From Swiss-Prot:
Family listed: Belongs to the FGGY kinase family.
Native source organism of the sequence: Symbiobacterium thermophilum (strain DSM 24528 / JCM 14929 / IAM 14863 / T)
GO BP annotations listed: glycerol catabolic process; glycerol metabolic process; glycerol-3-phosphate metabolic process
Quaternary structure annotation from Swiss-Prot or TrEMBL: Homotetramer and homodimer (in equilibrium).
Catalytic activity: glycerol + ATP = sn-glycerol 3-phosphate + ADP + H(+)
Lineage, opening ranks: Bacteria, Bacillati, Bacillota, Clostridia, Eubacteriales
Name of the protein in its database record: Glycerol kinase
Enzyme Commission number(s) from the entry: 2.7.1.30
Length: 498
């Protein structure tokens, strides 16, 4: 039987997806199943791990049924996932001891504050590349051990397992035979030494997490094991695993140091490949593992922007400026410029490179002549300005000058935003033909490990341009506009600190 397909499982924050790619890297079929968001208290976010698994399994079954592709034609499975989200389960029964604590959940902020007060910030940064924050998995695991009755005792007896979502899916797909994660997901736990590629005993001891809970950390392109025929109906190698943003970097063929991509979703995630060098950030970025292939590990710098496309949703849902987010482009283009208006969408504070949780959203530069179109244009421009903030930090930390930016995510369909992004960065912006770069990255990693594709060079050749945008703004105008943005940001900072 000709194995002509790779199956990517893309387990996200709101839905579980299964996507089939053929040997050309073309999307053959996809299925998407949403699941519940659970909010037990303000600032707390959970998912039901059983629901994550059932929706993911159903997506696989449905995409095969819909495309008519048989399991015997699937060469390998790749997994990509929402990062940091934490599951602890019973090793014997496979049952979760508590709901999954989602990356957005802030309940462990007091644990983080205690850790910082004890002087751990420099050590955490040096070992893991991360800042101490409730975003990452480590304090979430500690919370489950400390707050769910009977769990700490079971953990100390070696009867429990922890994993990010990739490890939870691997465990279930293999019928409980494989407990493993990849380097990129491990690097988001705040428990993993990114230089030694090992769980850090000192941090585990400080957080009171028994080592027996932890999955084996393996390269991202690697055969983890085979699916249990009793679960899926056939034994298929699980051969590629990466966190969603790292998978998108790989799917965009950002294989060389200095290659960068920005994903425009609710927020924006920008990653720059730094090669075999884990570049420490002095500018509020995260140092993370991009992927491991064979015995080679590549690193990346990452900047997270909290509010990107969500600012456009705000204009639509709260201010009722338009009915569809896509209408923002025509409205923005109905005026020649923003009329001196700046919008700083710091609705939940500011992420990289500011990390100011007390910043709040502002609109400045209003005059009697300001209309909906000016505010809409300024809101779209704010996404591009925030990206420039992150890029400036990346270039400073890495010493690498960006020569082009690859883009993906929902908002890249907005041609006005993409052109302004190119203008304000002063570099070309490239939008690929295949929008599903995250799933494609997972498929590529799996296909490489099984010989379905021969090399990264072959994958780079498959990358195809949909549309390129080149800077059309004079340099002095670019810098004048950006200086205005920096002034606006200063006025937004620290607003809620009173």
């Amino acid at each position: 039987m000709n194995k002509g397909y790779v199956l990517a499982l893309d387990q996200g924050t709101t839905s579980s997806r299964a996507i089939l790619f053929n040997r050309d890297g073309r999307l053959v079929g996809q299925v998407n199943h949403e699941f519940r968001q659970i909010y037990p208290q303000p600032g707390w976010v959970e998912h039901d791990p059983r629901e994550i698994w059932s929706t993911q399994l159903r997506a696989v079954q449905d995409v095969l049924a819909r495309t008519g592709v048989r399991l015997s034609e699937v060469a390998a499975i790749g997994i990509t996932n929402q990062r940091e989200t934490t599951v602890v389960w019973d090793a014997e029964t496979g049952e979760p001891v508590y709901n999954a604590i989602v990356w957005q959940c802030r309940r462990t902020a007091p644990i983080c504050a205690e850790l910082a007060a004890r002087g751990w910030a420099p050590r955490i940064r040096e070992k893991t590349g991360l800042v101490i924050d409730a975003y990452f998995s480590g304090t979430k695991v500690k919370w489950i051990l400390d707050n769910v009755p009977g769990v700490r005792e079971k953990a100390e007896q070696g009867r429990l397992r922890f994993g990010t979502i990739d490890a939870w899916l691997i465990w279930n797909l293999t019928g409980g035979r494989v407990h493993a994660t990849d380097y990129s997901n491990a690097s988001r736990t705040m428990l993993f030494n990114i230089h030694q590629l090992a769980w850090d005993e000192e941090i585990l001891h400080e957080l009171g997490i028994p080592a027996s809970l932890l999955p084996r950390a393996l390269p991202s392109s690697h055969v983890y094991g085979e699916t249990d025929p009793a679960v899926l109906g056939a034994a298929i190698p699980i051969a590629g695993v990466a966190g969603d943003q790292q998978a998108a970097l790989f799917g965009q063929a950002c294989f060389q140091p200095g290659d960068a991509k920005n994903t425009y979703g609710t927020g924006c995630f920008m990653l720059m490949n730094t090669g075999d060098r884990a570049v420490p950030s002095e500018s509020g970025l995260l140092t993370t593992i991009a992927w491991g292939i064979g015995d080679r590990v590549e690193y990346a710098l990452e900047g997270s922007i909290f509010i990107g496309g969500a600012a456009v949703q705000w204009l639509r849902d709260e201010l009722r400026f338009f009915d569809r987010a896509a209408d923002s482009e025509a409205l923005a283009l109905s005026v020649p410029d923003s009329g001196g208006v700046y919008v700083v969408p710091a609705f939940v504070g500011l992420g990289a490179p500011y990390w100011d949780m007390y910043a709040r959203g502002i609109v400045v530069g209003l005059t009697r002549g300001t209309g909906r179109a000016h505010i809409t244009r300024a809101t779209l421009e704010s996404i591009a300005y925030q990206t420039r903030d992150v890029l400036g930090a990346m270039e400073k930390d890495s010493g690498i000058r960006l020569n082009r930016l690859k883009v993906d995510g929902g908002a890249v369909a907005n041609n006005f935003l993409m052109q302004f992004q190119s203008d304000i960065l002063g570099v070309p912006v490239e939008r690929p033909k295949i929008a599903e770069t995250t799933a494609l990255g997972a498929a590529y990693l799996a296909g490489l490990a099984t010989g379905f594709w021969r090399s990264q060079a072959e994958l780079a050749d498959k990358w195809a341009l949909d549309r390129g945008f080149t800077p059309a703004l004079p340099a002095e105008e670019r810098e004048r506009l950006y200086a205005g943005w920096r002034r606006a940001v200063e006025r937004a900072r620290g607003w809620a600190a009173e």
